[in-house]
Amino acid sequence: MASDGNGAAAVAALGISGGGGDDWAPPLRRNLPLLAPHEVKLAKLLLSEGQSHLFEHWPEPGVDDDKKRNFFDQVCRLNSSYPGGLASYIQNARKLLADSKAGKNPYDGFSPSVPSGEVLTFGDDNFVSLEEAGVKEARHAAFVLVAGGLGERLGYKGIKVALPRETTTGKCFLQHYIESILALQEASCKLVEGECNTKIPFVIMTSDDTNALTVKLLESNSYFGMEPSQVHILKQEKVACLADNDARLALDPNDKYKIQTKPHGHGDVHALLYSSGLLEQWKSTGRKWVLFFQDTNGLLFNAIPSALGVSATKGYNVNSLAVPRKAKEAIGGITKLTHVDGRTMVINVEYNQLDPLLRATGHPDGDANCETGYSPYPGNINQLILEIGPYMEELQKTHGAISEFVNPKYTDSTKTAFKSSTRLECMMQDYPKTLPPSAKVGFTVMDAWLAYAPVKNNPEDAAKVPKGNPYHSATSGEMAIYRANSLILRKAGAQIADPVIDTFNGQEVEVWPRITWIPRWGLIFKDVKAKVHSNSSVSQRSALVINGKNITIQGLSLDGTLIVNAKDEAKFNVTGHIENKGWTIQHVDHKDTSEKEEIRIRGFKFNKVEQLELNY
C-alpha cells in the first residue's frame, strides 16, 4: 500500500490544485502509486471530464490490482481509437445529449432542395458509354467494404458476408465481391497499352464480432482468387457507453472494472483509413477513387462501372449511388440543404426527417411523388465513390471524424433518465456534412431492380412489410438477382419467360428463371450483348449457370437446368434444345430446425432432380 508521501506525490502528479485530491475520487488517490505515468495522465483526463464515479468502488491497493491495470488498458484503447481522444468523445456527447434533451432539430435553419445528379437508364447509349468509362477508371480505384455486422438480425449466426448471395451456386457475398473486383481489374488492365500489373486494393472494415471469422473465411478459401497482399483488414473499436445526460461513462453491468462499450457505426471507416496510411500509399501509386460499399447488396456491382464512369466524366468529389425512391419510403433521401447563413451541403436525410423538414419549409405536401411517380429526392443506398485527392485533404482537417448523433431511449417525457445506456454513433454516408460548398457532390440514380437488393430483415419482420414495399430479406435478395439477370438477358435480345408469383416465409415474390453468371462473363452490358444472341430462349422453370469468361449463347432453347463450365480462356458456344427435369423449388419453413440457417431464412431450397453439366 502506498505511503501518505507517495499518495501526495501522486495527487500532485494529477495536477489537481487546492488539495482537492481528497474530494476527487479518494479510492483513485489511494491507488495512484500502482499506475504508470501514462495511466496517471488518463486518470487526470477522466477526472477533469467528470468521470470520478468510475473509481468509487475501487478497493485498497493489493486488491484486484490486475483488473485496475486492465481498466486503464481499455481506457487507453478508447482514447487512441477516437479522433481527438476520449475527452473529445465525452465533450461531443454532452453537447449532443443536451441537444437531444432540448429537442433541438439538427436541420434548423436549413431549407431542402433537389441536388444535381445523373439519372441513368439501363442499356441505352449513355449507360453503355459510362460503363466503358468506368471500367477504364477501375484500375485507378480502391474498394472498401464495411463489414462489422453479424447476421443476427437476419436469423443467421455467422458473419453477413459469409451468407450465400444466391443458392443456385452457393457463392457467398464476399466471394462475389472479390470476383467482381478481379473482373474489373482484368478488364481495366486490358485497355492499357503494354504491360499492366495493377492490383486493385480491397479493404474490409471488421469489428470484434466479425474480424476472426472474416480472416478465417478468406484464408480457408485462398482469398477467393485475390492475392493476400491486395486485401487489408482494418478493425474498428467500439466506443464508451453513456449512462446519463451528463455523459458519465457507463460501467459494464458484469464487470465494475470495465467501461461498457457498443459499436460506433460504419462512419468509423474514414478515421481508420486516415490512420492506416493506406490513402497516401494509394495516391502515390496512381489511385484516383475510393469506392465504399456495405455487406449484403447482391446487385451492387451491376451499378459500379457506370457510377464510376459518372464520377470520372462529371468530376464529382463525392458520388452517392441512389435508386428511385417512393415518397415516404423507409430509405434516406439525398438532399441539398441550404442554411440561412449561406452554407450548403448535399447529404442523406433519413426518411423520417425528410417529410417534416419539407413541411416546415414551405412544402405543404411534404415528401410527395412528382410527375415521374417517384420522390424527387433519390434513395440513398450507401455506396459512395470519393475522389482520393479531395478526400485526403478533408481527412487532414478532420482526421476522419464524422458528424455524430445520439439516440437515447428516455424513461419518460422529462428526458432526465435513460432506459439503458446509449452511445454516440456515426454513419459512413455523413462524410459530406463537413465539406466546403465548393466541393462537387452529386449522385447517380439507377433502377432498383438493377442495383439494389439488400439483405437485412429476418423472415418474421419481412413478412410484416406492407404489400408492395420491398422485403429486403434473404428471400427477396436472392430472387432479385434472378430477376436482374433475366431482365439483362432480355435486354440483350434473349427470350426469357415471365416469372410466376410464389410465397416463401410469408413473402410474395416473383420467381424468374434461376440465371447466374460469373462476373468475368458479364461485367458490363456490352459484354453480355456480345455473348447472347436473340434466337435463344429460357423457360421459367429453368436454371442456367455460366461459369466461364468466353461462353456464348446462340440458338439455345433451355427447359431445365444447364451448368456450363469453361476454364480460363476456353471458348464455347452453347446451342440447341436442352430439356431435362431440372431443379424444383421446395418450400422450407423458417422454423424448421432440420434445415441450415442460410436455407431457413430464404424459405426455399432447390431439389436437384436432373441437370446437364458441360465442362470445357
From Swiss-Prot:
GO MF annotation list: UDP-N-acetylglucosamine diphosphorylase activity; UTP-monosaccharide-1-phosphate uridylyltransferase activity
Reactions accelerated catalytically: a monosaccharide 1-phosphate + UTP + H(+) = a UDP-monosaccharide + diphosphate
Pfam families, per the entry: UDPGP (PF01704)
Keywords, in A-Z order: Nucleotidyltransferase, Transferase
Protein role: May function as the terminal enzyme of the myo-inositol oxidation (MIO) pathway. May also play a role in the salvage pathway for synthesis of nucleotide sugars.
Needed cofactors: Mg(2+); Mn(2+)
Organism the protein comes from: Oryza sativa subsp. indica
InterPro entries (UniProt xref): Nucleotide-diphossugar_trans, UDP-sugar_pyrophosphorylase, UDPGP_fam
EC number, as in UniProt: 2.7.7.64
Name this protein carries in UniProt: UDP-sugar pyrophosphorylase
GO biological process: UDP-N-acetylglucosamine biosynthetic process
Family to which the UniProt record says this protein belongs: Belongs to the USP family.
Domain of life (superkingdom): Eukaryota
